[in-house]
Amino acid sequence: MIWPWSSQACAISDTELCNGHRARISPLALLSILLALLLFSPLLFSPASASHINSGQDIQAAIDSAQAGDIISVGAGSYSSIIIDRPLSLIGEGRPVLNAALQKPAVTVKSNGVTLEGFEIRGVEKDTASKFEYYMKNREAARGQRLDVPNAAVLVEGSDFLLLNSSIYRAQAGVYALGAEGITIKDSILNGCDTGLFLHGGRGLNVSGCSIINCRKFGLDIEWSGDTAVKNCSIINNSNVGILFREGEGADVDDNLISGCTFGLSLWNASHNQVRRNRVDHNYYGILVTNWSCYNNITDNLLIDNSRGEITAGFGIGLSLQENSSHNLVVGNVARGNYNGLEISKGCQYNAAYANNASGNKHGIRMNENRNNLIFGNSFLNNNINAYENLSRNVWNTTIGNCYSDYQGEDENGDGIGEQPYSIPGPQSKSADHMPLLRPFGKDEERMGAAGLQELVRGYATLPDEEEAEPAARLEKGIMVISSPRPRLSPRWGDFEPLDVSRSPFQEENYF
């Protein structure tokens, strides 16, 4: 039998003539050919063979000669800065060290789809004088460049970058990225940097299983970015903020340890985020939600021993909502051993605090200068002051109220609800819990979901506005104003605002 594909013209099944004969391929033969193509196609279309770099060899030369998709193995040793300008994977064997220099990141990523795994990366700390001197001596290096970019260990200018099982030490910025999407940092250490990671204008950041420790400013500084996930990380001893989300939305912050910071986690004008099951301890502010941060769910976090003495003896707040942050759900959190366990302050409205346990704090919950927040189903036990309201008017019950360990009323009909209201203490307080619980709201009760809570807020938080007292005197555009009606809404951004001496400590900027 003559093989029918003896020429290109005859490589057609069933109907073509080959040497004057009609050829036919049986279905079984055709199936065998297709299976063979499937089995051997990886060999026919395999990527370029991986380059292997041993200690002392030139990584940059290997990168420059590699093809897209190559895997470059880097042996143990110490190497200078590299630039990756094509989609490659660099795999460290024996923990090779990449060293940054002044204004020269250890790694500059200029391509999408780069993976860096198994490296120790040593950065350069902030040194303004040396940076100025560098650019004065290297004028061409400064041409067309932003001179305010920090000394970064890893500079990311592409998307879909993966940093795996690596360590970054003592950089002004451990990882620095502008407008990058799809960055993943996993099972890595960012230690002793000014800022562990800075991301501006990005999307899809995923940080998991990492230790971000001993940073002098921020552990993670994420601004104007969305769809971020920070999970199963240790954020410890970062001097200013452990995690800052500013002007962004869509973040999931789950199952982290956040400890030893001034602000553990801060949401600053950041909305539609989920903060769940984190342990937050030994900070000044455990979780701070401020500056118009709205529609966030703060759920099932452990807020303990946020009470320190370096600035103000014993001060510390487990969870604080401030500065017009509204429509947030604070649910199922445990606050213990703080100065204020829970706090809602300054212009916040339509928040729900539900099914929380605040015990053994100076104040269980403190409400300051706000109204129309719904507080119910919580347990305020053995605090110096269980609940406190200052210049506020809030709603403290639905069909159930809260449990207070100092409640003295009676339950005459045995329904678990006290017959006498619990008056909320505080200057000029008019609020009361009309359905105080005789036992803590516990795990036996089925917890209400987010949609149900939002519906209750709309139904119960309907107290009318009241004219609030104006401070006796204030400085306004250089003129001392003795008295005038107070505007109902503060301006969001003010260029010439008087100093607000009543604001909470440690807030760097005052916009109101």
Predicted features, each with a name:
Residues 60, 64, 68, 78-91, ...:
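Extracellular beta-strand-rich solenoid/capping regions of secreted or surface-exposed proteins
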Residues 70-73, 315, 349-355, 369-512:
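Acidic, glycine- and Ser/Thr-rich low-complexity intrinsically disordered tracts
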Residues 57, 78, 88, 94-96, ...:
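Residues at the loop-to-beta-strand transition
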Residues 67, 85-86, 93, 102, ...:
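Parallel beta-helix/beta-solenoid
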Residues 43-65, 76, 406:
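Right-handed parallel beta-helix/beta-solenoid
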Residues 100-108, 129-155, 170-177, 191-200, ...:
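Extracellular beta-strand/beta-solenoid scaffold signature
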Residues 1-5, 10-51, 163, 275, ...:
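Secretory targeting signatures
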